[in-house]
């Protein structure tokens, strides 16, 4: 992943080496840092950016808990200030449900967590001014948390439930292959030494139905995707809705009061990836799983 930083610099995420590094406009590498901090036994912070604000401060998610501890149902949005590297908790959000597998002895323990596909979770994003926007999965409403801590909550949005059948399961598996399958994290203890590794996980486009049935599935899809909420230049938050398998992509758009002001439809297998001064950048896939980047005029 690549993130824009002030001064025409970018932030590169290197999962293979478990580090992040900045790259300047002169193509010289800058400071590096680990993707995980803390002790897995008491609480691990995975410092993989989900957003960067206009000051270049990085926002990551903390899942809390630790080896041998019950996993909490909420995570924290952490702001890492560039320069000082100070960390502040700026919001809390609901985590997706997981299955946990543990093996080994006290000094040789292996803990693996797998997210339950399509389980409800909150989504969040960050505006350029550092405001946090969250979509709450309980009743599907959007709230904004300003840099001073004040909160504005919008009205709940009513949507029709989408049942999960075999087509929805197949589409989920295919989407994991399209986007790299998300990030898998493995923590291991070998003779008292702790190691953390990262990789791309998830199902594949050719997963058999029998493989899909091995997962734990909810009865219905949640109202929206738990992926990053993107804020456009008009300070509107774009939340991607869940739909029936094979249907066009839908985005609900919310203003700074948390009220839905528009719903936009994109072609099937398309998703918003970024915004420019007056355009929307959309990634799409064709029948051969080739990626294309499109620029649309910004809807008003």
Residue ranges and their predicted role:
Residues 1-300:
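Eukaryotic scaffold repeat domains enriched in small/polar residues
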